[in-house]
Amino acid sequence: GSEMCIRDRIRDVQKLAVENSRLGIPLLFGMDVIHGYETIFPIPLGLSCTWDMAAIRESARIAAIEASADGISWTFSPMVDISRDPRWGRTLECYGEEPYLIAALGTEMVNGIQSQGVAATLKHYAVYSVPKGGRDGNCRTDPHVAPRELHELFLYPFKKVIQNSHPMGVMSSYNDWDGVPVSASYYFLTELLREEYGFDGYVVSDSEAVEFVESKHHVADTYDEAVRQVLEAG
């Protein structure tokens, strides 16, 4: 449907939540908003080719204004994964393969989005962009990413953007690292993200990441056990 339809639907549901629920707590509506909302800008890979930090920040600001007008206060953007495998189908959503450039662009995206009171969410934390066989949705990281490569390449953009622009959110990915699901990893979600990087926002799991702890990684016997592991990880 049209954006007007989306706006009307969000308004109706929000009104119901505020006026007809016991506590009257507003709902939080989120959307990807990767490269624009009503105004469509170039794909992230195209934006990165400009090296124009001011223009990239402005594109994020405009997208946030438009999304906010529809009642959306939460974006699943920016995506600061590093593209290292050309077979991977989400390369176009990345800013390329250079960690420093990705961190710089991610910082500007967060600044632009959050300047309008809309939450930015860094994704996908972490080591999401090298799935086995380059097949998106595959929960196994392949090839094995060594610790030095992990920290100097894949985690660098997350660390820098968090310290430079303080995004409100981080999305935990559904893949593993060294045999441990990232979304159930205390090392990734607490020791690195909060204690070392200083992140103080919320963590949201990627689609089915909690379920996959049981169904694909097989490190939990039940879904309830998977939920427990994820919550205790951070």
Each language-model region and where it sits:
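Glycoside hydrolase catalytic-domain context in secreted enzymes
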Residues: 1-234
